[in-house]
């Protein structure tokens, strides 16, 4: 490093000038108008921050890399960014928590039902694949709803256990419900499924995919009653294990991977259903997904089933078994969405002592995710869908300051000559961007 002194300048400069692109898109989406029409709680005092400022401040903080409420002060102390957004001052991080405490279960249902319905009604896609999953969010304190439950990575620790629904075709999240940590994957599943479909009203579901946590008679009956095609991973009870280990008509798809199918009727089912079975030889495919079946007296006549990992799916599709298996494998992308929510958007780190406030914050972060996904679809020219961390480095982290002429404001950006054109191309695209947006164009 050169030997030099330091001096400070009085000009207000933001390190996040690239956020101008995202807030311009939100303007084009009439986001503020939709928020105020959704029934969000209003402030009781004239001195309180407007709800839209707190919601946009949360978006900005998460997009810039905030990983807890305390980090939202990065927006508060960025005077240039606040000026760009037309705010007199930025909100203290405790103002976000106080506002979120106004949300209750009924308010969450009303607000996010309206916002999600409005968002998806402006996107053109149909005959889509809907994925359902749950995840574990570990808690370090004694927040409301934090309890000991299913937690494979940190057994015995308190956690929440939210449900999520994903629109696979557009890489967006259709629904988010927070649940206590001591609930199973199937708790509240029917209500969650109905709520998800209501948020996507007017669009046809082509396929529903679920993991084994949703393997239940009630959900199968509901999907069939609604005429929805499905593939659901089977929970491994003894009858399923027996069917897998006593199957003889295996067809080899590739070395170490075999597939078969049969008709199965569980106790309590009014009718039999088709199940597709897959087994993968561990020695040949050591990273294969599936479960190993341990030796039991019930299966003592079997000698070699322990060398396989098994998967099993119930479906109403009449497609070949291989296509059913390949179709279900695409559900793994929902795991990538969950990882992105946790790693890039820090959804599991924004937690309050109030359960419904935490759920409301999680839903706002999901909305920030969806708008970022829309931005990637509509405005970024790339065959690869870039993660938020990459977008943060390439676009958001752009030093800038706000200037003014006689009749307008000018945002001065500090970008290298090589990267100015890519930034300008997105800015020009924004001028033509409008809703409804056809996702098939991207």
For every predicted segment, state its role.
Residues 208-216, 236-239:
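Acidic, metal-coordinating catalytic cores used for nucleic-acid/nucleotide bond scission
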Residues 1-199, 399-442:
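Dynamic "connector" segments at or just before major functional cores
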Residues 38-46, 321-328, 344-360, 376-387, ...:
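Short, solvent-exposed helix-loop connector elements
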Residues 72, 136, 258, 321-355, ...:
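Short amphipathic alpha-helical "interface-anchor" segments enriched in bulky aromatics
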